[in-house]
Amino acid sequence: DFNHVDFSYAGEGGNLSLKDVNLHIKSGQTVGIIGGTGSAKSTLVQLIPRLYDVTKGNVQVGGVDVRNYNLEVLRDQVSMVLQKNVLFSGSIYDNIRWGDEHASEEEVRRVCKLAQADGFVSEFPDGYDTMIVQGGNNVSGGQKQRLCIARALLKKPKILILDDSTSAVDTRTDALIRKAFREEIPNTTKIIIAQRVSSIEDADQIIVLDDGKIAGVGTSEQLLKTNDIYREVYESQVKGGGDDE
């Protein structure tokens, strides 16, 4: 829950990046966040694991103000995958198990299947023992994103945040990832920031952000009727072919 949240990178008295944000997200929901560049989409989700603290108001997880959690406990419950997450040099196994170093081989494969990574990993001659070079430059952007999603899933988070982290994945694979989320981790709250409408179209609720304020909340169907910003983005992508297949 976000309760009357204001946020400024400069603290009290600074220019507000987020203004009076009120938001209720039910446990297990899939929530999409969309908005133009500079609408503070990433800033909003970074307040959940306390990468930053609110300037005013509060953010709650499970009914408790995030500032009242032990930071390690809070961050164990929240997994965030960025658009440009990093892989380090080592095997694919080692990279995934960074999410939980005690995970079994079976668990690693399970999360890779969820993230639609098992298929391409299994095709590598060395499979999960394939060595990743520093920065992950020997796998494609879309493969890297899927491995990072798998790593985040291994933590078994209560809240999974994807910050434009399927941007390099084709829309079919993106849809398969979301289907797997719905079927296999229904109790995990999933927050998806996206540029592509197709990535969030089937979300339980979509939040439209504009200049740090909530400009609309609803399902895709509702927002198409009531929200000009969402409708414009939707029509430009769907009719303009801006959504790659």
Spell out what each predicted region is.
Residues D1-E245:
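ABC-type nucleotide-binding domain
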